Amino acid sequence: MELQSDRSKKDIADALISLMKKKNFDKITNKDITDRAGLSHITIYRNFKNKDEIIKYYLDELTDSFIKESKILYDSNNFSSYIEKLFNHLEKNKDIGVLLYKANMIHHLKDEFDRIFINKAQKENVEPYHYYFLSGGLYNIYYFWIKNGCKETPIELANKFNNFYITKGSK
C-alpha cells in the first residue's frame, strides 16, 4: 500500500519533470509544481527543501527501479551483462538525461552511478577506488552520449565501456 506522502512526492517529482519539458528549470516555481501536481502549496515544503531535492528524489526512484529490475548482481562472471542492462535502462530514460543536461543538472546522475557501485564496495568490504573508477567511467560515457545526441545503441555503449575496461582499466 502506497502512503499518501509517497504518492505526493511522486506527483511532485512527475510534475517538475513534466514542467521541465516546457520551461527552463530556473523559471519553474513551487507554485507551478503544485498546480501541475494538483496539490496544496504546503505539500511541497513538507516533502522537499528545494527543486534540487525533488530531482534527487526522482533519480533515486529511477535508480531503485533499475536495481530491482536488473536482478543481475555485479560480479566478475556477468559484468558485461550488467553494464548492458544499465545502458538499456539509461536509454529507456534518456529523456530525463537530456532534460538534466539542458538544465545543467546532469551531475546529479553521477551521484546515482556512485550509489550503485559504492554501496557494492561497502557491502563487499573492498577497495572503493575500483568502484569509483567504474562509476566515473560509466557516467562520463553516458554524459558524452547525451551531449552528442544519443546516437549509439545501449549495446554499442556497453561494448565501448567493456572493451575499454577490459583492455585498459582492469590490468
Predicted segments with their positions:
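Basic, helix-initiating cap at the start of DNA-binding domains
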Residues: M1-L19, K23, D32, R36
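Cytosolic nucleotide-binding catalytic cores of signal-transduction proteins
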Residues: D6, M20-N24, N47, N119-A121, ...
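Short amphipathic alpha-helical segment with a characteristic S/N-K-E followed by hydrophobic residues
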Residues: I12, K27, N50-I55
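Amphipathic alpha-helical linker/stalk segments
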Residues: S18, K22, I28, D60-Y82
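Short hydrophobic/aromatic patch on the recognition helix
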Residues: G38-F48
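Helical hydrophobic small-molecule/effector-binding pocket
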Residues: D75-D114, P128
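Amphipathic alpha-helical packing segments from all-alpha helical-bundle domains
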Residues: K102-G136, I166-S170
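Hydrophobic alpha-helical segments that form the core
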Residues: P128-K168
